[in-house]
Amino acid sequence: DRICGSTSGRTTGKITSQTGIFYNYLIKSKGEEFAKKYLEANEKAISNIEKIIQETKENCDFERQDSYVFTRQETLVDKIKKEQASVDKIEKGKSEFIKQIPLPLEIAGAIKFKEQAQFHPIKYGYALAKKIIDNNGRIFENSKVTEIKREDGKYVVYVNRNKITADFVVITTRYPIVNVPGYHFLKMYQSTSYAIVADVKKELFDGMYINLEVPNISFRTIKDGDRRLLLAVGFDYKTGTDEL
């Protein structure tokens, strides 16, 4: 119920167009033009975030970094190569297939996306909130929306037993909070993953990483004053079903 108090403040802080192995599927299901627009929209989002941080002059630990999806299994290399070829179809030179990465791991292959980014999600959330307020916007925390209706050409938002009427409503929650259309509540489930931050006392790598095989583990570095720490996140599973 607070800014960055839940999922938004607990992400890995990666800002990337590389959503796993996805573009090969997207081209097959939606076509090259749709996939190109998807890639361009994500790239524009990275640039917009960078611009907002520059304008607000807030320290959000923003850094341009390359992003990698890698595998240690030879049987998955072909999948990565097909993904790289698919990305090449919509933007030549955006990605490349490589056999070595800066991580101290032996790998079978990886796809690298150039000039992606990482940041501190909570610092950015606060900077964004400040920018909204500075532009005469208002933010209300602890204000749970329970329903949205269309009445007399307006939207009526029900909040904490009160109503707000608006010409336009933008829903930017992690998943839609309205049941119709979509019935998303019938399709969703809770999942759990784990994060570790460690001071490994060594010079750390550049870049952001996630492996293709299951379980997925994500790696990146984070700033802590003069130190760089290792952040590892992964072992996602359906809550209440599996044992670690």
Language model features with spans:
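Glycine-rich FAD pyrophosphate-binding loop
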Residues: 1-10
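General beta-strand structural signal in soluble alpha/beta enzymes
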Residues: 95-99, 139-141, 159, 171, ...
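N-terminal glycine-rich dinucleotide-binding loop that anchors FAD/FMN and/or NAD(P) in oxidoreductases
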Residues: 12-37
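Flavin (FAD/FMN) cofactor-binding and adjacent substrate-gating region
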Residues: 21-28, 48-127
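Active-site substrate-recognition segment that forms the wall
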Residues: 47, 55-63, 145-147, 163-244
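N-terminal FAD cofactor-binding segment of flavoenzymes
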Residues: 9, 13, 40-48
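Short, histidine-centered active-site or binding-site loop motifs used for metal coordination
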Residues: 30, 115, 234-238
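Helical element adjacent to the flavin cofactor pocket in flavoenzyme catalytic cores
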Residues: 78, 85-89, 110-168, 172
